[in-house]
A protein has these predicted regions:
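Catalytic alpha/large subunits of respiratory electron-transfer oxidoreductases
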Residues: 1-212
Length: 212
């Protein structure tokens, strides 16, 4: 009764990075019953939409790392964020000399890669075919990109995601028997939260507005 007395638009709900889907769903239903549109599971402010599942999951699966013949990393350090996945990348690089490029902060990933820069222009150059690595992607049968929270939580994260999707389209990363567009999450609950659309309802506030 006390919560209800505040009115739905004056309260908000946030889901933690380790929350289970059942708890998030129950909280979402409670907020809906109170007329509250302000909820978010993206505590880090990641610019991800819940509308298209293929736009926020790791589509190729970890096994897809073994199949790819070129890899673009965007705003991610898989050695720190996903060590098992990084080991698979290293294995492909070691056995097949997998060509790898990174857009983002340079780091020791335990394998060789080409650092393309750390901004939207670097990604745009790949989309427009103005960088030599664009030819590598275009010549590949199963090109892959992995975009991480280091890119998606930036102020221009939405633009970076849109450009990454454009790179994916230009270089045929998504075809009938292959989907090389991957989002690497650092929060265990994130995909589940997006699956049940634990995001602002129409007219609702997201994490940034809730915190201000």
């Amino acid at each position: 009764k006390k919560i209800k007395s505040f009115g739905g638009k004056s309260i908000a709900a946030l889901a933690g990075d380790l929350a289970c889907i059942e708890s998030m769903f129950a909280l979402k239903e409670l907020m809906r019953s109170l007329g509250c549109p302000n909820l978010d599971c993206r505590q880090d402010g990641a610019k991800l939409s819940a509308k298209n599942r293929a736009g926020y999951i790791f589509n190729s699966g970890i096994a897809g790392i073994d199949e790819t013949d070129s890899l673009l990393l965007i705003g991610t350090n898989p050695r720190v964020e996903a060590s098992v996945l990084n080991a698979r990348i290293r294995r492909n690089w070691f056995s097949r000399r997998l060509p790898i490029a990174l857009i983002g902060e340079p780091a020791d990933l335990t394998y060789d890669y080409e650092h393309l820069g750390n901004n939207l222009d670097s990604l745009r150059a790949l989309s427009e075919g103005r960088h030599p690595f664009a030819e590598v992607l275009s010549a590949s049968e199963k090109p892959m990109l992995i975009i991480g929270m280091g890119a998606l939580t930036r102020a221009d994260g939405e633009a970076i995601l849109a450009m990454a999707k454009q790179v994916s389209d230009v270089h045929d990363m998504v075809i009938d028997d292959w989907n090389g567009f991957n989002v690497l999450h650092t929060a265990a609950a994130r995909v589940g939260g997006l699956d049940i659309e634990f995001v602002p309802a129409k007219g609702g506030s997201d994490i940034n507005d809730i915190q201000t």
